[in-house]
C-alpha cells in the first residue's frame, strides 16, 4: 500500500515538474516574442521618423528661380547640419552633401577615367590598386572596389566619402569640390588645396571666374566637366531613441526642367551593421 502511495507521489511530482518546465518554456518564449515585437515596433517608429525627416530635408535643397538653376556652394543653408527632436524623444540629425563635388564613378568608363582614379587614390594617400585591364568598369557604388585584392576596409572607409555615381551629365561643382577630387582632374594637389581654402564665401558665379584663379592657367581642364551648380545631392539622416539607432541615406536628383527633387536610391540600416557610407 505504501509502495503504491510512493509511486503515486512520484508520478504527481513528475507531472508537476513537466508542467513547470512547460510553463517556464512558454514564459521564456513569450519574453523572446515580446522583446522581438518591441524591437520591431521601435524600428518601425524610427523608420517612419526617418522618412518624415527625409521630406523635411528635401525642402531644404537648393531652390531654382524662374526654373533656372543657381549657384550652389557649401555656405548656403542646405549645406548646414540639421538636428531636431520629436515629442516621443526621438532625436534626428541630418546633413546634405553635393554629389557633384565628388569623383564620379561614371568616369571610369571614359578613356581618361583610370588616370583620374589613380590621381584620386594618390591624393588620398591610399595604397595604389590595379584596375582590371581590358574591362569596362561600370561601378555604381564605392563598395564595388572591394572586388580588388588591395582594397581593405580602412582603404574603403577613406575612399568612399570622395566618390559617388552620377549620370554622364554630372559635372564637378567647383564650389563644393574638395582638394583630392580636384587633384584627380590633373590639378597639382597644393594648388587644389589652396583653391579649396580660398574659395569665396558666396561661391564662384561662373566657371570662367574659377578658371581665372592663379595656378590654373595652362592646365588641360575640360570645360564640359565643370559647373558652379548641381542637380545631385545625398541626404544622410540618423534617428536615435534610447539604444535604437537607424540611418537613412537618400540620393536625390533635381529635374533639369524645374529643379523638382526625385529620389534615385534609398538605404535604411541599423548603424551597428553599417558598412562604410555609400
Language-model features, listed with the residues they occupy:
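Compositionally biased linear targeting/interaction segments
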Residues: 2-278
